[in-house]
Amino acid sequence: MQHECRITVLETKVFEDYQEHYLANPKSGPCPCFRKGDTFLLKRTPERDDFYRLMDGKFCGEAWDAISRYVYTALQGGAIMHNWTNDERMMIAC
């Protein structure tokens, strides 16, 4: 059985006080990779393997690091959020 994993950007945040204090460019602004509502559909088939290719560069490496274990679980058909979310196939990550 083959499974898919949909990733949806629920919202983005900018913490200007942290940017101003810690970044080399304090006016860097919001992340340029994602916008609220962006949706990505990942597949893992013999013809297409989005997981190991990080979606051919369409995904931020830092964000991928934060969610990849959940994506891998979903692509295998598993659920890791049993009794945590109202749908055990759904995960919300920051």
Regions found by a protein language model. Give the residues of each.
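Short, compact, well-ordered microdomains
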Residues: 61-94
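A short beta-strand micro-motif
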Residues: 4-11
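Short, flexible N-terminal segments of the mature chain
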Residues: 20-48
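Generic recognition of cysteine residues
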Residues: 5, 31-33, 60, 94
